[in-house]
Amino acid sequence: MSAFKKSLLVAGVAMILSNNVFADEGHGIVKFKGEVISAPCSIKPGDEDLTVNLGEVADTVLKSDQKSLAEPFTIHLQDCMLSQGGTTYSKAKVTFTTANTMTGQSDLLKNTKETEIGGATGVGVRILDSQSGEVTLGTPVVITFNNTNSYQELNFKARMESPSKDATPGNVYAQADYKIAYE
């Protein structure tokens, strides 16, 4: 093979390889977020912003029974150090609050989709404790830790309700904030 052909071959291979080096075959950005909190337990990633799917409930159920079946949800605590600095923690106090309650129903979360096109009316969302007792918004629910493990579960439920039995079909969305205190 002549020197010219060898040079041409080397140049061709170099061009092919250089195209792969400079070709953009996909790119993106990875963002990381978190927060350091002063507490004996960490909240499991993803549980700081939960979504509870209450499903599709027939309006006839809400008009007759006034309530849907309750759907469970859990706030998971991890990396718990329940004994530290002479203090032992045996309970979590979870307080739910909201700026939007149904008129005349201070413990029923308002459907904020109610005023939008396609929003259900006459429907709110009720938070329940693990035993299906109604949670009073703004009042702590005390949960005793079941052991001294570093992993704990705070179990609750939620359901749709129509106290006036006049629910209309449509989308339902409600929101509550929660805070955890330890004792």
Swiss-Prot record:
Cellular compartment(s): Fimbrium
Name recorded for this polypeptide: Uncharacterized fimbrial-like protein YgiL
Return the similarity comment.
Answer: Belongs to the fimbrial protein family.
Q: Name one GO cellular component term.
A: pilus
Task: Please report any disulfide bonds recorded for this protein chain, giving both cysteine positions.
Answer: C41-C80
Instruction: Look up the domain of life of the source.
Output: Bacteria
GO biological process: what's one of them? cell adhesion involved in single-species biofilm formation
Asked whether the UniProt record includes Signal among its keywords, one would answer yes
Which keywords does the record carry? Disulfide bond, Fimbrium, Signal
Kindly name one Pfam family recorded for this protein.
Fimbrial
- Its signal peptide is 1-23
